[in-house]
């Protein structure tokens, strides 16, 4: 039975192997490739199919010519190839035996020559076939690929990368760049302008990809169409000095406006609440105290629209009142002054107005822009007028938001409830939050399971400037965290998990704080256009002198903004304000207390302490100009508290002391601090434990100390020991 490979049959019939394979598929004969073997039956099928097609082709002359040529090819090619392997072996053996017997006849030699001839012919045909195959592919390789409609890139592209995107040879692009006056190599990076010029020359559109960090909630903020914005309630925070009536005022507003007309309504403390005045709502944040206000602002949460500054009419401006003013001004929030306790006989509102003018809060009655309202939180007098003024300021501020979008806002409070799990009070700042919304809150995520408003009622949806308590989060967020609702729960989950992972890695990465050491570099890089400064000094005169000197410093492109001043020790509140405002704290003849030191280390706030005003001014000016000399850093090694004093003739005052922190060393430099103010700075004259002179005394032990040329030591004084260490500027 005759058998042959597909490529042999194709060659015999002057067809391509592909055409033969297609014919076989049409006859339902399965073959894998051109090397597959077909038997005589299949060949008959093929020839029968081919004859039918040829019969209808209308070219008898060509068929006849092909038929005349085929026998010669059959005789030359098929005879050695189609013979079975066994026959060939027998032929070789018989040929070898004939040679051994000496039968070297012409007939015996012919098959050998014929075999060699056929072998050469076969190789020649194979070479022809390879050449034909190569020639067949060549046009496909050289065929030019079409130009793309658009080229996208991020940042920059090399010449080679751009050539690949344009389906062009790099050499072609290099020539174009040469015409543009740019000498480039294949690996040279091209800027945006060069990429756009080349693509424009080819008529291809260019689009720069903007890489968005999906874990950054801020990147999902889309600017709303002004036509979609609607008026929203103002968010109000009440601030002021201790015992000036902040909490009483909050309670008075709540009792007069929340409970009236809502008999049987349950008021639930969720950290914020709403009141309705003349058909309009006002949201109050129930977070009296500057720490909460400032901590949220330090973490990027600007939630307050208006600040009500409460000042007692019988007490006037107090230290925390000044702090509250500084906090509100640093946040850029309008201030309404509520002069409280007007029901008291000793009330003197004119004195309050006079004192507040020193802090640029001038009453409207005196030609200023600050609204003053006389109120009594106890009797309820002036509450309505105060709320009307809040609405007036809100109207001037034009507070608007788009309710028809996915909600976003800020966490006011959060806690872990034993029965309900993580619970968070959110303030929706834009959009509408609905039950069932997937949500990312800080580094947590979840689905809003239930929402309760400030009246304790379950709600299904809340709009802008509305506080609401939600459940359904996987963890407890922190106050000040931003939240964003999503349409897709999978996306919310992936972003929440990515943010949680990043938080673990970075441990809530700190924002870069301004410090004098790195001030010049930050100015050069354009990161700092304004230096916020907090001044604390021992007396008011020093504060004013320091303020005047600092404001005279003139360095091109940078100005000094004094956000807060005060008299006395540097407190934790000062450090919190500095952290929130990215400020430097300058102390003149004062020291930070223990809490302030710890907070400054945690928040990385730069504290500069001086005893000469000129030195402070010179240091800041040099820092702004990038000319700071290598500095000596003060390292506190110990602190002792004076428990009692003894006066001994010829020796002076001996301080009976107790080491509260670190250790006190005989050779260290010390300073004596009284009520946060430095009274003395010098060295130790004698350090004794019982009657023995000692070199040092560790924490938890008592000792006796005398100071060099100083005897005005009193009980309660703090003696601080320190050494100066030289540090390199970075």
From Swiss-Prot:
Keywords annotated in UniProt: Cytoplasm, GTP-binding, Initiation factor, Nucleotide-binding, Protein biosynthesis
Region (G1): 240-247
Region (G2): 265-269
Region (G3): 286-289
Listed InterPro entries: EF-G-like_DII, IF2_II, IF2_N, P-loop_NTPase, Small_GTP-bd, T_Tr_GTP-bd_dom, TF_IF2_bacterial-like, TIF_IF2
Positions of region (G4): 340-343
Transmembrane segments: none
Protein name: Translation initiation factor IF-2
Organism: Halalkalibacterium halodurans (strain ATCC BAA-125 / DSM 18197 / FERM 7344 / JCM 9153 / C-125) (Bacillus halodurans)
């Amino acid at each position: 039975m005759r058998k042959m490979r597909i490529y042999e049959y194709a060659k015999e019939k002057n067809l391509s192997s592909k055409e033969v394979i297609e014919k076989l598929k049409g006859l339902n004969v399965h073959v894998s490739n051109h090397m597959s073997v077909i038997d005589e039956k299949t060949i008959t099928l093929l020839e029968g199919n081919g004859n039918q097609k040829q019969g209808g082709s209308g070219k008898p002359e060509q068929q006849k010519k092909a038929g005349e040529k085929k026998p010669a090819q059959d005789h030359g090619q098929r005879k050695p190839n189609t013979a079975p392997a066994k026959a060939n072996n027998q032929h070789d053996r018989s040929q070898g035996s004939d040679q051994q017997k000496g039968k070297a006849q012409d007939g015996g030699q012919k098959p050998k020559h014929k075999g060699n001839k056929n072998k050469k012919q076969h190789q020649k045909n194979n070479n022809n076939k390879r050449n034909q195959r190569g020639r067949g592919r060549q046009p496909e390789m050289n065929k030019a690929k079409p130009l793309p409609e658009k080229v996208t890139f991020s940042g920059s592209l090399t010449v080679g990368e751009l050539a690949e995107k344009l389906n062009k040879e790099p050499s072609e692009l290099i020539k174009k760049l040469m015409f543009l006056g740019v000498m480039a190599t294949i690996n040279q990076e091209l800027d945006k302008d060069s990429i756009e010029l080349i693509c424009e020359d080819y008529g291809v559109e260019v689009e720069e990809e903007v890489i968005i960090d999906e874990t950054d909630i801020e990147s999902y903020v889309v600017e709303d169409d002004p036509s979609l914005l609607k008026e929203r309630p103002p968010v109000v925070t009440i601030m002021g000095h201790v015992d000036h009536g902040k909490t009483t005022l909050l309670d008075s507003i709540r009792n007069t406006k929340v409970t009236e007309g809502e008999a049987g309504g349950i008021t639930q403390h969720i950290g914020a609440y709403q009141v309705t005045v003349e058909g309009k709502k006002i949201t109050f944040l129930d977070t009296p105290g500057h720490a909460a206000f400032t901590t949220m602002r330090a973490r990027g949460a600007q939630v307050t629209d208006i600040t009500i500054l409460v000042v007692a009419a019988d007490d006037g401006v107090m230290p925390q009142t000044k702090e509250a003013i500084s906090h509100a001004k640093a946040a850029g929030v309008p201030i309404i002054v509520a002069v409280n306790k007007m029901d008291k006989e000793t009330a003197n509102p004119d004195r309050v107005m006079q004192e507040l003018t020193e802090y640029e809060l001038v009453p409207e009655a005196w030609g200023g822009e600050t609204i003053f309202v006389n109120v009594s939180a106890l009797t309820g007098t002036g509450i309505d007028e105060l709320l009307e003024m809040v609405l007036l300021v809100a109207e001037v501020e034009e507070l608007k938001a788009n309710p028809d979008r996915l909600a976003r806002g800020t966490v006011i409070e959060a806690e872990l409830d034993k029965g309900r799990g993580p619970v968070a009070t959110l303030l929706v700042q834009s959009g509408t939050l609905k039950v069932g919304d997937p949500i990312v809150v800080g580094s947590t995520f979840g689905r809003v399971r239930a929402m309760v408003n400030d009246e304790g009622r379950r709600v299904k949806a809340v709009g802008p400037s509305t506080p609401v308590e939600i459940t359904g989060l996987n963890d407890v967020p922190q106050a000040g965290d931003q939240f964003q609702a999503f349409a897709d729960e999978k996306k919310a989950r992936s972003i929440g998990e990515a943010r949680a992972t990043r938080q673990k890695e970075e441990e809530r990465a700190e924002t870069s704080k301004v410090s004098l050491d790195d001030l010049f570099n930050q100015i050069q890089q354009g990161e700092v256009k304004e230096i916020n400064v907090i001044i604390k000094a021992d007396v008011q005169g020093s504060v004013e002198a320091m303020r005047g000197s600092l404001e005279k410093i003139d360095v091109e492109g940078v100005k000094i903004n004094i956000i807060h001043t005060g008299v006395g020790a540097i407190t934790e509140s000062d450090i919190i304000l500095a952290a929130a405002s990215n400020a430097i704290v300058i102390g003149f003849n004062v020291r930070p207390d223990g809490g302030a030191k710890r907070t400054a280390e945690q928040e990385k706030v730069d504290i500069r302490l001086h005893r000469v005003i000129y030195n402070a001014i010179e240091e800041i000016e040099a820092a702004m100009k990038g000319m700071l000399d290598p500095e000596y850093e003060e390292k506190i090694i110990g602190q002792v508290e004076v428990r009692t004093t003894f006066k001994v003739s010829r020796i002076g005052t001996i301080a009976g002391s107790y080491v509260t922190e670190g250790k006190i060393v005989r050779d260290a430099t010390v300073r004596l601090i009284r009520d946060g103010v430095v009274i003395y700075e010098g060295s130790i004259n004698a350090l004794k434990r019982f009657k023995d002179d000692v070199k040092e005394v560790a924490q938890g032990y008592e000792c006796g100390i005398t100071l060099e040329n100083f005897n005005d030591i009193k009980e309660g004084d703090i003696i601080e020991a320190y050494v100066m260490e030289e540090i390199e500027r970075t």
